[in-house]
Amino acid sequence: MGIGTAPSALIAHGIETTAVEIDPVVHEFATRYFNLPLNHTSIIGDAVNMVDEMHTGFPKKTYDYIIHDVFTGGAEPIDLFTQEFLNGLSNLISPGGTIAINYAGDLLLPSAISVITTVLSVFPNCRLFREVPIPVPMGKEDFTNLVIFCKNTTETFTFRIPNEADFLGSPARRQHLVPQNEILDARQTVEGKGRIIRRGQTRWLEASQLRSARGHWHVMRAVLPDIVWETW
């Protein structure tokens, strides 16, 4: 959840919103200090258990939009990227609905390639967008923020041109709302390079996660001056 930017935007657009957060303090701080509106359903708990439980309910609740946005950058909760968990989310999407999956990592590492491979194994129709263009020439690292939009249908989908109301007065939304830097032919790009991530079989990812965490740290060091990190 972080500070609640995404759920706040959904609520502002009149979308009935359910927010899932494992840490009650994160939800409390988002509400108290970052103005997360109260008119939403909050579920405090493990998303893996929550998704499993939602499939046992009757009638099963489905969602038009699902945002899968957890901290990654080498410390990702890998259980939230397993084929089993993503299958569970797929079954919660309403007909014609969409899921957006945010992942930050080094796209040259097996962990990132395997996350993409696993997502594409579940959803038949995905479009992938990088935060920054592919570096030229390619170096030893390719750390970027990645958003994967997927649907359960096979029809081509596009993004409409945003209007002023979509930005909610935010310069950041104005700059980033329209997806850019699409990775074309993503299935062909990762084919044969990654493994399907399965529940209970994730130990092999640990080395890649450590390298990705180092890459994320180097990126964060460029966000603020050294003195800030040294003081912190």
Spans of features found by a protein language model:
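E1/E1-like adenylate-forming module used to activate ubiquitin-like modifiers
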Residues: 103-106, 130
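The AdoMet/dcAdoMet-binding core of the Class I SAM-like
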Residues: 1-100, 107-116, 120, 141
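Soluble small-group transferase modules, centered on the S-adenosyl donor enzyme superfamily
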Residues: 125-232
